[in-house]
Amino acid sequence: DVRVQAHLTATQVTIYLDTSGEALFKRGWRDEKGDAPLKENLAAGILSFTGWKPGQTLFDPMCGSGTFLIEAAQMALAIPPGAIRAGMYGDDAKPSRLAYRPLITSAHGFGFQRLKPFNESAEQKRWVDLKEAALAGMLAKRKQYPSVDSLNISGGDINEKLVSMFRGNWQRAQLPDQPMVRQVDALAAKPPANPTDGVMLL
């Protein structure tokens, strides 16, 4: 189905075709959340505003269900925000038993995929080419950051339940290994030590 929206004033009506479908902040990996979840796109925007760059150490001592750290990892690995709904993984993420909303999957797609022009062969090919280019970029970044350690991304939270949620969300986001996260009070938390080359702590 194609979703149509109308904005009505006293003198005119404006018709919009919804080319997005489900809200774009819904990446498809977060089906568990804490009491005050941060929207995924807001977390990504804040990270960009701080000037953080992939490869730099990022430590979130109050990580909650992991929104900041997962968005950062996806940036580092060149994973497009809509990768899951675009069907760029072999299998969709499986929702947990604590899911608070249905997961966005490749079956949802984007709103524009239901518009008639998208069914033309040229548009279909352009869509395939875009996804293949994105996948190539993702593969290149996986070689650059082959493990969770190489990402230099870690976090902690005093709430054990949120730490568990973070681990589940990390896996559903198709990120490598298990996240570097532990249950710890933010006032006592310290980022993991990362000695320079040739230096070992004993």
Predicted regions and their residues:
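Class I SAM-dependent methyltransferase Rossmann-like catalytic core
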Residues: 28-41
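Amphipathic alpha-helical repeat scaffolds
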Residues: 169, 201-202
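Non-catalytic substrate-recognition/targeting regions of SAM-dependent transferases
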Residues: 1-29
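Conserved S-adenosyl-L-methionine
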Residues: 38-189
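Beta-sheet entry/capping signal
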Residues: 3, 12-14, 55-60, 152, ...
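Generic structural hydrophobic/aromatic packing signal, biased to beta-strands
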Residues: 6, 15-17, 72, 153, ...
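A short acidic, Gly/Pro-enriched loop at the edge of an enzyme's catalytic core
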Residues: 191-201
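Short, solvent-exposed polar/charged micro-motifs at secondary-structure junctions
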Residues: 5-7, 190-193
